[in-house]
Amino acid sequence: MNTEIPDLEKQQIDHNSGSDDPQPIHDDMAPVSRIRSSGPNHEYIHIADQKFHRDDFYRAFGGTLNPGGAPQPSRKFGNPAPLGLSAFALTTLVFSLCTVQARGVPNPSIAVGLALFYGGVCQFAAGMWEFVQENTFGAAALTSYGGFWMSWAAIEMNAFGIKDSYNDPIEVQNAVGIYLFGWFIFTLMLTLCTLKSTVAFFGLFFMLMMTFLVLACANVTQHHGTAIGGGWLGIITAFFGFYNAYAGLANPGNSYIVPVPLDMPFVKKD
């Protein structure tokens, strides 16, 4: 099967040339005279004399932290999203397991090291690399949540004296609740940017948003059951993160199980 799209080459008139004839624009880019598709289900795209698979074009995909259709970046580097997503997911999982008191461990101190170096430094570095990849959404998300985990670790560490600066434990919990509510607002903003993406991508940010909201409520109300609920939401969030990270790592060349992106139900297909 072969379909063609009419000539896309455009010319502009140089009004200063004194000629009524259109003058072509000359630059370093080769003109694209024709785009066509071929193969079963139009899986190949032909641009001039070059052939690409449709999968070579970026689309909404959790494995790249790309919330919508986007052109390929001009620089060729490895995909930093799986590193950032894995760092986020593992740190979130350990923290959330402590929150639900798995195996009788309510103290989240074991997650401080992860929050500093993996969920913090590694995730932040992955976010910086997303800027190089020209992915603004991925950069904003990974650097911000890397900063979140480092700031949470600072709150938990006695060396910073943050908790000791408050007069009583109730005041500490209220302050942490305000802190988490701020992160709920930020995550709500990101979630709204994933409505045209995939189910797994949207699910990650929606569940994270709900986790922040429930944990914020648990802190300001000092309600133990609400905190447990927030912990379970965090566990679900972590597995969404692991799934999106795996989606960015797996391909037909290294795995027999390659996730297929499932678009949100109301997203229009091109």
Curated annotation (Swiss-Prot):
Positions of modified residues (Phosphotyrosine): Y58
Keywords: Membrane, Phosphoprotein, Transmembrane, Transmembrane helix
Main location: membrane
A Pfam family annotated for this UniProt entry: Gpr1_Fun34_YaaH
Modified residues (Phosphoserine): S74
Places the protein is found: Membrane
GO CC annotation: plasma membrane
Region Disordered, residue ranges: 1-33
Induction: By acetic acid and ethanol.
Record membrane topology: Multi-pass membrane protein
TM region(s), chain numbering: 80-100, 109-129, 137-157, 175-195, 198-218, 227-247
Result of altering S74 to A/Q: No effect on sensitivity of cells to acetic acid
Protein family per UniProt: Belongs to the acetate uptake transporter (AceTr) (TC 2.A.96) family.
Function according to Swiss-Prot or TrEMBL: Plays a role in the adaptation of cell metabolism to the utilization of acetic acid, possibly by inhibiting an anion-transporting ATPase and affecting the plasma membrane H(+)-ATPase. May be indirectly involved in the repression of genes encoding glyoxylate cycle enzymes.
PANTHER family with a match to the protein in the record: ACCUMULATION OF DYADS PROTEIN 2-RELATED (PTHR31123:SF1)
Entry-linked NCBIfam families: AceTr_1 (NF038013)
Name under which the protein is recorded: Glyoxylate pathway regulator
Organism: Yarrowia lipolytica (strain CLIB 122 / E 150) (Yeast)
Source organism phylogeny: Eukaryota, Fungi, Dikarya, Ascomycota, Saccharomycotina
Gene expressing this chain: GPR1
